[in-house]
Swiss-Prot record:
Keyword Chloroplast annotated: no
Protein name: Uncharacterized membrane protein YuiB
Main location (coarse class): membrane
Location(s), subcellular: Cell membrane
GO cellular component, one term: plasma membrane
Annotated Pfam families: YuiB
InterPro entries membership: YuiB
Keywords: Cell membrane, Membrane, Transmembrane, Transmembrane helix
Highest taxon in the source lineage: Bacteria
Transmembrane residue ranges: 4-24, 27-47, 78-98
């Protein structure tokens, strides 16, 4: 069981972390929604305990294990991961607003 202060700090941390990563990737790659597309893949790597090669060698077992782990996530874990997705989406919105107002990043 995760305590409430840890959940609150984790929510803020994931939001700020993925906002920052998304903002930097958006500036460098000039693709506004790159982090919002990459984030679900990052979440699957965070949730999964399988190695990447196991998804190629034995996909049935690996994806079944991943599906089971996704379904067994606690509400706090889902809330933390959703806050990271919100940070990635807000970074895309922020970079679009800055570009529309004439700011050129790199």
């Amino acid at each position: 069981m995760i305590s409430l202060p840890v959940v609150i700090i984790s929510i803020v941390l994931f939001f700020v972390l993925f906002f920052g990563i998304g903002f930097l990737l958006n500036m460098l790659l000039r693709m506004s929604w790159i982090m919002a597309v990459i984030y679900p893949i990052v979440c699957l790597f965070i949730i999964s305990k399988e190695k990447l090669i196991s998804y190629v060698q034995s996909p049935g077992e690996s994806f079944a294990s991943l599906f089971h782990r996704v379904l067994s996530l606690a509400a706090a874990d889902v809330l933390i991961l959703v806050s990271g997705l919100a940070g990635a989406i807000v970074s895309g919105i922020a970079i679009n607003m800055l570009r529309k107002r004439g700011y050129q990043m790199f």
